[in-house]
């Protein structure tokens, strides 16, 4: 598919990326339509994919995507977690329409649905996991491009790119390669200079691993701050004057005491001596006479009632 042009040939850097990501490693099962893309079989039963055929199909898929005038008419889909981030990155780079996550049945066939779309080209990550959009695309005559493993069914798939579509690194690298070739064929980036976007941005990362890395980085930063605060804190030095004789060094203020008493004019006078509180005055009244008289009055009233 490269047409024998040296510009479109696969470089050594691309081969090293494929090998590092494990793109050439297939599965233990083989579909009869995928036999043409197999290089050999290992002793443990894993099939090796021919990377030359992978590169040719990658260029063919990029040419099909570039042929669409409106980039938004290209729909890229990935229902599996390993390809959702790569699909979103590819859509932001090329202008395609992404569907990451669950595909709503009837998106291509049910016109009453709010999420109804009419794309001109469909690109999926896994034909087995994304069987619903591939089936609906066959109803409305939408050509389909798929990343296919050794055991992937090729029913309703027009352009199959043989690769390892199970590994997170392999899937991310394939979408990165496809985005780079699309931008190169459009003339957005040059083939003479490497693309500034790294393939790591297309790799899927487990949220738990990201959280663990953030916690480890926070703990490391905390321990580093504590270490610097303990050992590198400047010690304050206070110079002290040397005193040979302590009696000479201490100055006692010589202030007359009478000065303070003279200034205070609002001091109350001292209280006068009082009588002896233990002696009580003699009472002149006779307290026993009153109750007797009162009692006689009450008795008189009672006799009247009787």
Swiss-Prot record:
Main subcellular location: membrane
Family matches, as Gene3D superfamilies: Glucose-6-phosphate isomerase like protein, domain 1 (3.40.50.10490)
GO molecular function, one term: laminin binding
Pfam family, one: Ribosomal_S2
The keyword Disulfide bond belongs to this UniProt entry's keyword annotation: no
Keywords for the protein's UniProt record, in alphabetical order: Acetylation, Cell membrane, Cytoplasm, Membrane, Nucleus, Receptor, Repeat, Ribonucleoprotein, Ribosomal protein
Comp. bias (Polar residues): 276-306
Alphabetical list of PANTHER family matching this protein: 40S RIBOSOMAL PROTEIN SA (PTHR11489)
Quaternary data: Monomer (37LRP) and homodimer (67LR). Component of the small ribosomal subunit. Mature ribosomes consist of a small (40S) and a large (60S) subunit. The 40S subunit contains about 33 different proteins and 1 molecule of RNA (18S). The 60S subunit contains about 49 different proteins and 3 molecules of RNA (28S, 5.8S and 5S). Interacts with rps21. Interacts with several laminins including at least lamb1. Interacts with mdk.
Entry's family note: Belongs to the universal ribosomal protein uS2 family.
Name of the protein in its database record: Small ribosomal subunit protein uS2
Recorded name of the encoding gene: rpsa
